[in-house]
């Protein structure tokens, strides 16, 4: 579960390494986010020469959580880290590569570009 002030790793090559959650979008009183939720965050660590810089306010979609996710078939999936992919306003990723596995639930939320760039979909 992702909440305000959570720090997430960035799973793409947009130039950001770590982001801090400012707000979870969707409704007026959403307190926690899970895989597939859009968040507003600020860049806390960045690589030199990247698309985004430290201090930039960005939108991102959560792709991995330590908390995990229950699926309809009864299975349960959880990851070793909390990670997100930076996106534009039209839900397309800012980076050109995605690192690490991505949950299959992103397919239901129309993130097909992220799914196609991911090396592994679980």
Curated annotation (Swiss-Prot):
Pfam families: Ribosomal_L14 (PF00238). One of its GO terms (molecular function) is structural constituent of ribosome. InterPro entries: Ribosomal_uL14, Ribosomal_uL14_bac-type, Ribosomal_uL14_CS, Ribosomal_uL14_sf. GO terms for biological process: translation. One of its GO terms (cellular component) is cytosolic large ribosomal subunit. Transmembrane segments: none annotated. Gene3D superfamilies: Ribosomal protein L14. The keyword Transcription regulation does not apply. Keywords: Ribonucleoprotein, Ribosomal protein, RNA-binding, rRNA-binding. Binds to 23S rRNA. Forms part of two intersubunit bridges in the 70S ribosome. PANTHER family: 50S/60S RIBOSOMAL PROTEIN L14/L23 (PTHR11761), LARGE RIBOSOMAL SUBUNIT PROTEIN UL14M (PTHR11761:SF3). Belongs to the universal ribosomal protein uL14 family. Part of the 50S ribosomal subunit. Forms a cluster with proteins L3 and L19. In the 70S ribosome, L14 and L19 interact and together make contacts with the 16S rRNA in bridges B5 and B8. HAMAP family: Ribosomal_uL14 (MF_01367). This is Large ribosomal subunit protein uL14. It comes from Limosilactobacillus fermentum (strain NBRC 3956 / LMG 18251) (Lactobacillus fermentum). The gene is rplN.
